[in-house]
Curated annotation (Swiss-Prot):
Gene assigned in the entry: pgi
Family: Belongs to the GPI family.
Name recorded for this polypeptide: Glucose-6-phosphate isomerase
PANTHER family from the UniProt entry: GLUCOSE-6-PHOSPHATE ISOMERASE
GO biological process, one term: glucose 6-phosphate metabolic process
One Pfam family it belongs to: PGI
Record PROSITE patterns: P_GLUCOSE_ISOMERASE_1, P_GLUCOSE_ISOMERASE_2, P_GLUCOSE_ISOMERASE_3
GO annotations of cellular component type: cytosol
Active site: E341 (proton donor), H372, K501
Physiological role: Catalyzes the reversible isomerization of glucose-6-phosphate to fructose-6-phosphate.
Location in or out of the cell: Cytoplasm
Disulphide-bonded residues: none
Keywords attached to this entry: Cytoplasm, Gluconeogenesis, Glycolysis, Isomerase
Top-level enzyme category: isomerase
Length: 533
């Protein structure tokens, strides 16, 4: 692999100053550097990847063993080596085929849990399961990280399909979050879902206790309006939640990959079991494509290779995710966890420090809002920010089709502007037409130059349906896997979240004045004195 990395870097240095626009002298450039899966189009032609770079990147994926590790993942081998676990979130959307874990087929158990979820969601949506004040009108999902970001993102994304109770999400331990969520709800018609695998997550259980106190005095049996997504049956029972409303999942489903199963219960309640199954089917379709398509036509592999080129080869430290769909407003936050928690590592699987940078910083906002915020830096700043646009051909509001067309035109305009830029001569000509002359023209013209040559990709699709969202999310999941394999890291642990948790537990009694601050640095002691009780 070392020779391929070196060849990629040498080639990148050779073409670094070549305008991307020059590559379009090839009339087949767009076609050759775009990939389709049914009605989904991934256009990566507006990058500086040429035929040589593409071939080297594909060789890199082969040398890294992407095929073998992909097959090992789907076969249920313990590719999460630091925790000794299989990685089988894909099984949650492929329950009609054997799923082997340590030689045992667990598919029947997955189907049973899924059927229980369907029955519960159906009964709640149809008014057969009620609150103590009548039909359930609101569902509050209490979780954090993977128990929140996925379903919260998906519920907003699929709002046009949400014909069930209103769904709300509480994650932050900041009391303002749960206060503002519950203040306008009726406890007698609200179901609270507590999503915590161990039922010990501090933020989640603190909010769950607050929600229970909110119900006490207003309903006769608060626990009767709680459900849980957890494997800790003893703790959910101690909380008072009946076993019929407890939905478990296995340790081979990582939190940030878990909304395909019981963590997605709130989504199933919102959009209904049929549309939830369409969401699963979309993910399964991407799984099949990932397993069967050759690398040169494989969307997750190509998306990952573009990411490797931009981050590890070109040195661009960030990646902007720019969905031109307001209902995908939470997608960048979801991908922040998916990508940065998975591939934000400093050591390889063998424990040695990485020779290359690991995953990029992922951020973004929906268009067109971002155009009036941070696109200034993307267009004219001194750092290159690779951009990933997502856009649908059609919206869900036929009477507002003219606005959707304006949205699409803005998306395409931004990718073209990043590619082309505006030269100094073009800026001068524009100012001259406005009557600006002399030194003032020269001064102002320089402020109107766009360097261009900024790389971007576009993922285009007909409409954001449940099945299409499933495809998109599975695409990004597999992209993370491929990048992790190429970098030689474990994408499925998250030890980086542990140290802060441990320190927070020790700091709480210091803030309460019950423990001394010996051993703390001067800054932390000062902050404890200022913020403590």
């Amino acid at each position: 692999m070392k020779q391929i990395w070196q060849a990629l870097k040498a080639h990148q240095q050779a073409v670094e100053h070549r305008p991307i626009l020059d590559l379009f002298a090839d009339p087949r450039r767009a076609e050759s550097f775009s990939t389709r899966l049914d009605d989904m189009l991934f256009d990566w032609s507006k990058t500086n990847i040429d035929h040589t770079a593409r071939d080297l990147l594909i060789d890199l994926a082969g040398a890294a063993g992407v095929s073998q590790k992909r097959d090992a993942m789907f076969a249920g081998r313990k590719i999460n080596e630091t925790e000794g676990r299989a990685v089988l979130h894909t099984a949650l959307r492929n329950m009609d085929r054997p799923v082997l874990v340590e030689g045992q087929d667990v598919a029947a158990g997955l189907r049973e849990t899924h059927a229980r979820m369907q029955a519960f969601a159906h009964d709640l949506r149809e008014g057969l399961f009620t609150g103590q004040g009548g039909r359930i009108t609101d569902v509050v999902n209490i979780g954090i990280g993977g128990s929140d970001l996925g379903p919260a993102m998906a519920c907003l994304a699929l709002a046009p399909y949400a014909d069930g109770p209103r769904c709300h999400f509480v994650s932050n331990v900041d009391g303002a979050h749960i206060h503002d969520t519950l203040k306008d709800l009726d406890p007698a018609t609200t179901l609270v879902i507590v999503a915590s695998k161990t039922f010990t997550t501090i933020e989640t259980m603190t909010n769950a206790e607050t929600a229970r106190r909110w119900m006490e005095g207003r309903v006769a049996n608060p626990a009767a309006q709680f459900a849980a997504v957890s494997t800790a049956a003893d703790r959910t029972a101690a909380f008072g939640i009946d076993a019929s409303r407890v939905f478990g999942f296995e340790d081979w489903v990582g939190g940030r990959y878990s909304m395909w199963g019981p963590i997605g219960l709130s989504l199933m309640i919102a959009i209904g079991p049929e549309d939830f199954d369409a969401f699963l089917s979309g993910g399964a379709a991407m799984d099949r494509h990932f397993r069967e398509a050759p690398f040169a036509e494989n969307l997750p592999v190509l998306l990952a290779l573009v990411g490797i080129w931009h981050n590890q080869i070109c040195g661009h430290a960030t990646r902007a995710v720019l969905p031109y769909d307001q209902r995908l407003a939470r997608l960048p936050a979801y991908l922040q966890q998916l990508e940065m928690e998975s591939n934000g590592k400093r050591v390889a699987m063998d424990g040695h420090e990485l020779a290359l940078h690991s995953g990029p910083i992922v951020w973004g906002e929906p268009g067109t809002n971002g155009q009036h915020a941070f696109y200034q830096l993307i267009h004219q700043g001194t750092r290159v920010v690779p951009c990933e646009f997502l856009v649908a051909r059609d919206g869900h509001e036929p009477d507002l089709a003219h606005q959707h067309l304006l949205l699409v035109s803005n998306c395409l305009a931004q990718s073209e502007a990043l590619l082309r830029g505006r030269s100094l001569d073009e800026a001068r000509a524009i100012l001259a037409k406005k009557g600006v002359t002399g030194t003032e023209l020269e001064r102002q013209a320089r402020h109107r130059v766009f360097p261009g040559n900024r790389p971007s990709t576009t993922l285009a699709y007909p409409k954001l349906t449940p099945a299409m969202l499933g495809r998109i999310i599975a695409l990004y999941e597999h992209r993370v896997f491929v990048e992790g394999v190429i970098l030689g890291i474990n994408s499925y642990d998250q030890w980086g979240v542990e140290l802060g948790k441990e320190l927070a537990i020790a700091l709480q009694p210091m803030l309460e004045g019950r423990a001394g601050t010996e051993g703390k640095d001067g800054s932390t002691r000062q902050l404890i004195d200022f913020l403590g009780r």
